[in-house]
């Protein structure tokens, strides 16, 4: 417990908020009579309640400090009084170390929306990209299809598609590059697309807008034809099958629509 005191003190000094996992076994470890005492000892922001707590205990604790519930196991109708009387109620999805055990999108969305409709903030996990946690080292995402993609891409999908309230990195390591991209979006609201262009280099570092009438299968750039010079010719080049994620520009065969991206 001495190491925990040192670690938590340092984290608080650095401006972090600490969410501590606690169970009834934690009382024995710290030799205290309530988990609220643990929260005071370590100066944590919120407690994530594991197994062993009855509803009355959760309600009493929720009135004193933020608590985090397991999003996968709680029933909304059972925690209405916690939301009504508690200081702050959050629900955290699990992360899944083993491949093929992460949540599917439909189930995740159903749970997330029902919790948010009840006034509960939802937290989910993305994998790291530098240091993966053992013993399996396959990432710690909430959603299975995030397991082998970049933390930035996983963060953007959780934020923009699923509208989760907070995103945590499950693994111990995430690169400075990925942190910078995530922070940039949080600061500016602009989505960064890392790409190497063989042509149309004038698009580098340009901020463009997605057309609001883009269909679900493509994203059209609003300013694309405005960026094309009047006398510019776009010859056919690399006219292969367009894979998911491909960025293409219409060539001269599209006549006055040439240049659309």
State where each predicted segment sits.
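Detector for Asparagine
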Residues: 12, 70, 94, 237-238, ...
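Context-gated lysine
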Residues: 2, 17, 25, 40, ...
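Active-site beta->alpha loop and helix N-cap motifs at the rims of alpha/beta catalytic domains
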Residues: 1-84, 88
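N-terminal start-of-chain detector that recognizes signal peptides
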Residues: 20, 63-64, 95, 137-141, ...
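Catalytic alpha/beta core domains of metabolic enzymes, predominantly
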Residues: 70-199
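C-terminal functional modules
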Residues: 196-261
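Electropositive, surface-exposed helix/loop patches at the edges of structured domains
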Residues: 18-37, 44-59, 106-110, 160-169, ...
